[in-house]
Amino acid sequence: MERILQNFSDYLMHVRRLSDHTVVAYVGDVKQFLCFLIENDIELKDVSRLHIEEYIKKLSKQKTKLNSTSLARKISSLRSFFNYLQLTSIKDENPVEGIRNPKIRRRIPDFLLPSEIQKLLEFSMKNQRDYLMLSLLYFCGLRVSELCNLRVEDLSFSPAFVKITMGKGKKDRIVPLTSKLAEKLENYITSCGKSPEDYLFGSQIKIHPSTVFRIVRKYTMMCGIKKRIHPHTLRHTFATHLLQKGVNIRVVQDLLGHSNLSTTSVYLHVVDQEKFDAINKLLQEG
């Protein structure tokens, strides 16, 4: 069974080209399901749709109740696992086919106001590294993992852009840099004496995501922002501000590296909400 799990992990990483985080989550979900099979004396080859439904019921009834998003991911993990077993002729059919994921209520992402972003960057300017990290998260809409994986060779200054090669789904993308940010990055690289193969933040060892979280938290507290802010909030803010300024949603999709437009569309709700708020203000004033 360990060999099957390892091969499944390799399949997700090298064939499906999923992110490391997603692979770990999927394999963990499958391990949990395999424990259920052992507890109930069920052979993997004998798993039917009925067993899958029983397992989902068990997950739904456990003390620490799963939210719809977590349950949907666990079902997706099993669907991928049995697809893999079909591909490798270990199982003839996929018992998860036809089982619907629970409906997920899309939560409108939190974002910062332009004045809050300005404060955040102003407070971090005394620390060159921190300022550049926050600037890349906001002006380029990077994920934390993408920021941590950036190497000097991923940056171009003529023309000015950053190449993201380790994004979710392993899809390369190009994100332009503002002239001001490009200049500051070039000065930072020169002053630190970095080589092309060095990590931008770090050298031989990349910076840890937890460090990025601490830096974001530090400056939000310093400038008195009361919202619960994390690095991904800056990515949400990047997308929201672009849409508010009338940028085409397809362009925003490409900049974010989303494979599906529906993922980007969630930010439209933020813009729509602003319209409703504006009308409500008129009603209140009237």
UniProtKB/Swiss-Prot annotation:
Active site as annotated: R143, K168, H232, R235, H258, Y267 (o-(3'-phospho-dna)-tyrosine intermediate)
Role according to the record: Site-specific tyrosine recombinase, which acts by catalyzing the cutting and rejoining of the recombining DNA molecules.
Superkingdom, natural source: Bacteria
An MF annotation (GO) of this entry: DNA binding
Keyword Protein biosynthesis attached: no
Domain Tyr recombinase: 107-280
Residue ranges constituting the Core-binding (CB) domain according to the UniProt record: 1-86
Principal location: cytoplasm
GO biological process: cell division; chromosome segregation; DNA integration; DNA recombination
Keywords: Cell cycle, Cell division, Chromosome partition, Cytoplasm, DNA integration, DNA recombination, DNA-binding
SUPFAM superfamilies assigned: DNA breaking-rejoining enzymes
PANTHER family, A to Z: INTEGRASE_RECOMBINASE PROTEIN MJ0367-RELATED, PHAGE INTEGRASE-RELATED
Compartment(s) where it occurs, according to its Swiss-Prot or TrEMBL record: Cytoplasm
Disulfide bonds: none
GO cellular component: cytoplasm
Family per similarity comment: Belongs to the 'phage' integrase family.
Protein name (record): Tyrosine recombinase Tlet_1492
